Amino acid sequence: MSVALAYGEFCEKMGAIKIEEHIFHHAKRATIDWFASTIPGGLETPAKLTFQALKEEIGSGASTILPAGQKTTPRNAALINGTASHTLEFDDIFRAGLYHPGSPVISAVLALADANDVSGEHFLRAVIAGYEVSNRIASVMVPAHYDFWHTTATVGFFGATAASSFILGSN
């Protein structure tokens, strides 16, 4: 079985997996941390420039842009909020992978959760899936990968994809 298939099957089964309460607790803490980084980061130049680049697409959609609360498409909200959450470098870190998982994972999950009206538990399960997949990938890629690439950007894609696939019910 390929690694991609194994991670896909893991995400597909995430809704049925028994998750201990302390894992949900850590997913909630990661989400709070994400908001604490994203709201002030949204006031900084990188997020403002990203917003300006997409301003023609703002106003239609169900996904929220922080900190002001405008609505847009899930793609735009994930990009703008992801930029904001990583701007101040106060976002969470997975030290073993030299990686900030919250920025890509929670930005994608929140954008899709807004647009798809998912439960809080479904949201948290998506966050857990994204962290699990991306942290495992980051663990095997560093430190050599970090010599040339920013792990949050390269590995974050996998976490955001895993979490998004769970939110959307993809396999």
What label would you give each PLM region?
Residues 1-171:
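N-terminal core-entry segment
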